[in-house]
Amino acid sequence: MEPFYYQHLEKSEQTIYHAIKTGLMALEDHFLVPYADPARISMIFFLVRLDCPEIFYAVTFKLRKWPQSDNLEILPEYLFDKKTIRQQQKAMSARVEKLARAVSTKTELEKELYIHDFICENIHYDKLKKPYSHEIIGPLGHGVGVCEGIAKSVKVLCDALGIWCIIVISEANPEKKIKYRHAWNIVKIGKTYYHLDATFDLSLSKTLTRHDYFNLSDDAIFRDHEPIMTEHVPCTDGSHFYYLEKKLSFTKQEEVKKRAAQAAKKKKPFLFHWRGGYLTREILKKLLIGIEEAAKEKGKQAKVSLNWMQAVLCVEFEDMDEAVAVSMQKSDDVDNVEIEQANEGELL
């Protein structure tokens, strides 16, 4: 199947795309492309790297125009010398093959979950934003990455496992204090498209592996994501949303209290999604009261954190005699809830 972004280019642009891809794969020092607006060539170069995350070593280029020529010459700027690139290509291929082999016989949904959890449990967000963290060698080679490198790693693993996957990009929004563009994935499971943002879940996975952004619809993802600036497909179905699949998505307050009591008894964390209408402060207050009552019945104190935009609550329980300042703080107080930031890497 032709690469996604390649399919959405005009014929003349596909010729440029092919020349760029061929030149980069061959590690050419320079190569020709048909003349076009430099800004458009830059965008096509960018799209090649979204379609082909295995091209991790070429991040920018210079253009040269020769008099009386119908072509432009591209001079790629490589992150490493060619010997190092070839060594890293072998290492990345072996790494991807090994990771993919572990779930090669699983279902598409199981493979997707494996990739997501691998990212959340093994990769650290690189707040220094080193150049290689934007490429697959960051997460897969060094265990660190930013959203672009993480989304590319998800795609290269999906490609290896036969899962349809693209990388999508949203613009920055300084008015909302969003300093950087953001990258995540759209995957196709069965015949349905879903948003998958492993970076946001990684940011939330401090004590538990989170799945707040696993298989979201457009309606859900754009509660806290900016509009996509690249070509993409609509995601109208949220039926494989993780918490829905795991029966951890509730519409009734009594359901939440019952499950909280079970978790408190076992002294296990309780992670759930609320879909019983918009999560207002009033509804949150009622949920917190039920959780606190369930905790006290089991001799526990509840500590609650909240991803408010996605209506996901994380509840942890501790013994009453271990609770800090238990007489001074009530966990059923909305103001005592920790508000989580899933997009901390993109904020100003």
Regions found by a protein language model. Give the residues of each.
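Linear, non-domain "peripheral" regions
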Residues: 1-95, 273, 278-348
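Secondary-structure boundary elements
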Residues: 78-139
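Solvent-exposed loop/turn segments at secondary-structure junctions
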Residues: 80, 122-126, 172-176, 200-204, ...
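Conserved short loop/turn motifs at secondary-structure junctions
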Residues: 138-143, 172-174
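Secondary-structure capping and boundary motifs in well-ordered enzyme cores
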Residues: 142-146, 150
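Hydrophobic/aromatic-rich core segments of domains that either
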Residues: 149-221
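Active-site lining segments that contact anionic ligands and/or coordinate catalytic metals
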Residues: 182, 267, 310-314
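Metal-dependent nuclease catalytic core centered on acidic motifs
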Residues: 213-305
